[in-house]
């Protein structure tokens, strides 16, 4: 299969969204507000470093040559959202993903989720403190008929299923249906997203994660 190829820079959001509090959590809506007012470049402009940096030209888009020091890039493409909002509940989440693209949701993070490797995750802790943001891009169903959300995390490709995860639908595990946000991109991209050998419903805008 093929995963989305158009990826924006989460590090710029960490650096520049005023009330997102960078790596210390915060308000997801402020990230969408920043994307509407300021725009976000492609990930190649500023790779994810999991650190809080000042919102300067150097920390928005930079270029590093083999024989020259890193320097800020002045001319680069930014991507914007035209509107954004709040959504909760499984049915409304699915309608939003189907109609307009991936959504961002806050979740709890118990130890066994940190150690997640593969398969459909089921929470056994009952923890409900929302402290981490992930993207929900679609949903699917196992051969045994178990429904699950398809989520993308920000902990690198070595975590989970190549940086992605599946979590059971219908139980609100990790509080995944309780606090989600959506954003509508201004530019309409076209991309193909699918998971081989699985029944899935994926958004055509998954490339904007």
Feature roles, as predicted:
Residues 1-209:
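Catalytic-core signature of thiol
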């Amino acid at each position: 299969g093929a995963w989305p190829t158009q990826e924006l820079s989460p590090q710029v959001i960490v650096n520049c969204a005023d009330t997102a509090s960078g790596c210390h959590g915060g308000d997801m809506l402020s990230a969408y507000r920043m994307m509407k007012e300021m725009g976000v470049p492609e990930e190649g402009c500023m790779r994810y470093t999991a650190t809080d940096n000042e919102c300067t030209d150097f920390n928005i888009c930079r270029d590093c040559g083999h024989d020259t020091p890193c320097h800020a890039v002045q001319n680069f493409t930014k991507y914007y959202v035209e509107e954004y909002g709040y959504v909760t509940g499984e049915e409304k989440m699915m309608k939003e993903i189907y109609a307009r693209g991936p959504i961002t949701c806050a979740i709890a993070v118990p130890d066994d989720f940190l150690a997640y490797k593969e398969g459909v995750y089921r929470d056994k802790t009952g923890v409900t403190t929302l402290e981490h943001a992930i993207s929900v891009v679609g949903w699917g169903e196992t051969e045994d008929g178990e429904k699950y959300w398809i989520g993308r995390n920000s902990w690198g490709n070595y975590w989970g299923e190549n940086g992605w995860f599946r979590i059971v639908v219908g139980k609100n595990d990790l509080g995944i249906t309780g606090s989600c946000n959506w954003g509508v991109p201004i530019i309409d991209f076209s991309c193909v997203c699918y998971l081989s050998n699985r029944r899935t419903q994926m958004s055509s805008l998954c490339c904007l994660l």
